[in-house]
Amino acid sequence: LEDLEAMPEIPSLGPEPPIVRIPEGWFLMGSDASEPGQDNERPVHRVWIDAFELAACQVTNAEYAKFLAADSHHKGHRKPLHWDDPNFSHPEQPVVAPSWFDAVAYCEWLSALTHKRYRLPTEAEWERAARGGAEQKLYPWGDAPLESLENYASRWKTAPERVGRAERNAYGLFDIGANVHEWCADWFDADYYHVSPERNPQGPPEGKRKSSRGGSWRHQTKVSRCAARSSIPPEFQYADYGFRVARDLAR
């Protein structure tokens, strides 16, 4: 955590978000029989992830508005559903209801603007980041129950919270596992863990649903376990879906 004090203020006012470096290393991905997990989270398997960078916060309305304003770069990418709904329109709230294609287009626009490679994280990268360097813990903060979170019962009533206001996990990530589901790069396969490679898994080569991670303001259980998986078709636009950008390390 030695770099946390040097992190920029949240949220960023420029086109690039505050970024956290996720170190390379092995970790145990998935949930074992002792956890309240789903079959698609098993078996637990060892995975190596190369170092990469991940945005400290989910992409905000303010950041997404800059993408929409860049007319030459967003042909066919209209304002997301709920863009003008006052429940979801604060500049510091995460943008909601972009499709997976919209999220990818945003990454491509930001890459062209900054000459750096922005993209969506893989499922494996997301889970490593959410765990914060600790093995087999249930939640981004550890194994303490959800009710241990401050004001848990009164939060996320009708919409996601503004980013950067909750506690950071051990890597310095805000709302990792909460607020909105986050699109991942991978196609989803419930049985993928049985054939996943050990190093930098990218997901199956094709599919019908795209993977997502993290919890949702709209669900009864507001924060997801680190190992929990979810997916929807890539064209869907839901009010509890958003995304967080990853960035390749400069070579």
Q: PLM features: what roles do these ranges have?
A:
Residues A239-R251:
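Short, structured beta-strand segments at or near domain termini in extracellular proteins/domains
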Residues I22, L28-P36, P80-S230, P234-A239:
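Functional-site microenvironments in short loops/helix caps that host divalent-cation chemistry
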Residues L1-M7:
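Long amphipathic alpha-helical scaffold segments
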Residues P15, R42, R168-N169, D240:
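Short beta-strand-initiation
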Residues I10-P80, A97-F101, G177-A178, A185, ...:
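A short glycine-rich, aromatic-capped structural motif
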Residues M7-E9, R199:
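Generic alpha-helical structural signal
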